[in-house]
Amino acid sequence: MLYQLVVDSPSFKKVIRLQNSCYSIGRHPSNTIVIPSPQISRRHATLIKKINPNLDISFHIIDGDLEGHRSRNGVWVNGESHLDYELVHGDVIALSEDIQIFYQAIPTDPKDTISGGGDRQRLTPDLSEHFPQEQWDITLIGHEDDLSQLSHEKLSKLAACIEYSPYPMVEIDYFGNLTYLNTATKEKFPSIQKDSMAHPLLKDIIPQREDTPIYYLRTREVQIGDKFYEQHIHYPAESQFIRSYIFDITERKVIEQSIHYQAFYDPLTDLPNRFLFKQELGKVLSNVQNQSSVLGLVLLGFRELQSLNDLLGHSVADEVLKIITERLSAHVRLEDLLCRWRGDTFILLIQSCRNLDEIEVFVRRLLAVLKRPFFIANNPLYLQGYAGIACYPNHGDNVEILLNRVGIALNEVKDIGSRQYCFYEESMNSDHLERIQLEHALHQALERDEFLLYYQPIIDVQSGRLCGVEALIRWQHPIHGLVSPGLFIGLLETTGLIIPVGEWIMRTAFQHFHHWAPAVDDDFRIAINLSPQQFQAPDLLPTILRILAESSLPPHRLEVEITENIVMQNVTATQNLLNALQSHGIRLSMDDFGTGYSSLSYLKTFPFNTLKIDRSFTKDILHTPKDAAIIQAMLLLGNGFNLNIIAEGIEEEPQARCLYDLGCREMQGYWFSHPLSEAEITAFLAEGNFQRFCLG
C-alpha cells in the first residue's frame, strides 16, 4: 500500500508520501509538514503511524502536539471535530476553511484492497497526478528483464552488487529450499541455514493457497531478539523463487515506541492516559454490546492533593501520585484498566461484573486502601479519596455519554463533601447545570459585593460574658436570595475563589470589629475558619499579617480555626506554620475536635489555644451517657494541656447546664443566638444583657 496526503490550499498544492513514524503539521518552519497559512496554528496537528499485530499500517491524526497543546481551529475530519482519529482511505481533513488534506491508502498491487473503517470507508481517486510531487524515497520493482540478454560482464556486476550489498537478501524456492544468501545475510543471521524454514525470516512466507497472486510484493515486520526488521518479500511472476530483502528498522521502532508512549502514556505514573483510555473503552464497548455483563467506570479524585501541591511543591505531590498508582494497581484485576485521567484524578474501567452491587463493593475496597497514610520522608500524609461511578448499560452505551456521566457523579460527591462515592443518577443532570450556573454567579459575587458576614456569639456561661464571635459567610444572591453556605463553600474551594474570598472575610471582619471595640472586653476575639486550600497557601502568614496591619487590629484579637484533617495532612509543615502564627500573637483553635483521626499526642506538639467540641457530641448529651463521657474526657484533656474548650451546637438550656456541670465554660449555639448580621451583632453588643446566660 502507498500512504499519502494530498494538500490542497489556495497558495499551494502538494503530495506527501507517508513513510516516517510521526509527522507534525503546522505553519511553524520547525514542523515536518509546513503549511504556510495564518489560518492554522503553529503546531496544528500530529500524524502518528501505527502497526497492529497483523502488521496492518494505519495513521492517526491528533489535534495539536504530543505535549497536549491543542490547535486554535481544531482538526475536522469529514465535517466532524476530533481529538484523535484513525484515518481511512478517502478521509478529508480540514485545518481551516480554505485548507483541505486528502488521506489516501493506494494499493500498489492489483490484488490489494483498501481496508479500514467500515461505514466510514469511501473510495476516492488518486489525486496525486494533479499535484506537484514531494521527493519520494522509493524503489520500484517492475517486471524482470530477460537476464539471458545481459552480457557476462553485466551479469557479474549485478551479482557482485547483490552479494556485497550491506542489506541482507535471501532466496528460497517454493519447496522451502534455500537457494541463495548474500554475505550480509550470513553475517547478520548465522543460524538461518540451520533453522531453515523455522527461522523468523522464512516462516510463513510460502503462499499456502492456490489463488495466491502470481506477482506481488509483500512487506512485514519481523522481530528477532531485541532487533526489528522490515522484510520485503518479492514473488516474481512466472518464477520458481521467492526473494526477501531485509532492512534493520530497530532505531525507527524505538522512536515509534517512544512517540507512542509519549502520546498515550503518562510519564509520571507509567499509566495509560486519557486518550488511550478512550480508545480502549470504545473497543470494550463495541465487544460487549451483546453480552449481559456490566461495566463500571470509576473516576477517582482527592480532596487535598491540589492544596498539598501548593504547600509542599510538585515533587512531594508527584511522589504521592506514584504511591497512589502503586496502591490502585495492586488492587485492580488484570482485566481492568487503570489510567491517569488528568492532574490528581484517576479513572478505572471495571469489566465483567454481574451487577452494580459488585462494582460498589470493589470501589469501597479501593477507597479503604487510599485512607491509609502516605509516608513522605517518614512524615504521614492523609488524603481523602472520593469517586464518581457510571455503568454500562445502566447509565449510557457510548464513550462520550459514560465519560460525561461519571464526571457528573464525581462532581456530585465533591460538592456534597460528606459522601465518599456515588453512582450517576438522572437527577444529577439538572443539578450539574445548576452547579455550572452557580459557579458562574460565584465569580461575579465578590465583584458585586454580594457576600455578607454573620457572627455567632461565644458566651462564657460561668461569668455571663461575651468572649468572642465566630465569623460566618453568607451569600445574598440577587435572584435566589440568601444562599446556604453548604451550596457554595465547596464551590469556592474547587474554583480557587476561596483565597480571595477568605481575604475578604478577614478584612471585613476586622473592619467591623472597630464598630464594637468600645463595647467588648480586652480578650474578645474573632474566630475565622480557614479551609484546606487557604491553610496550605504558601503566602498565608504574610497575607494575614498584612490585613491585620491594614486594619489596625491587634493579632491577639484573631483566632484562626482549622479542622483536625487539615492538621494531619502534613505534620511538619503544619507545626511550622502554627508556630509562626502563634509567634505573632495570633490565637489558634482546632475545630470539630474528636471527629477526625489525629493522634492525641499532637495536642502536645501543636500550639493550640482552643479546642472546639463538635455538635455531633453535644446534641444528644442529655440522652446518651457515652457522649457525656467522651465530652468529660475531652474537658479533662483540654484542662491538662491548659487549653480553652468551646462546646458547639447548644440549642437549649438543659444542654448548657449539663456541659457546665461537666466543667465546660464557653459555648455557642442557637440557645444563645442565631448567627447575626453586622447590624444585629452591633445591637446585641449594645444591649449587653449576657447575664441571662450565666449558669455560675
UniProtKB/Swiss-Prot annotation:
InterPro entries linked to this entry: Cyclic-di-GMP_PDE-like, EAL_dom, EAL_sf, FHA_dom, GGDEF_dom, Nucleotide_cyclase, Rev_trsase/Diguanyl_cyclase, SMAD_FHA_dom_sf
CDD domains found in the cross-reference section: EAL, FHA_Slr1951-like, GGDEF
SUPFAM superfamilies recorded: EAL domain-like, Nucleotide cyclase, SMAD/FHA domain
GO cellular component, one term: plasma membrane
Domain of life: Bacteria
Annotated GGDEF domain residues: 293-426
Annotated EAL domain residues: 435-689
Recorded GO MF terms: cyclic-guanylate-specific phosphodiesterase activity
Signal peptide: none
Protein name, per record: Uncharacterized protein sll1895
Organism: Synechocystis sp. (strain ATCC 27184 / PCC 6803 / Kazusa)
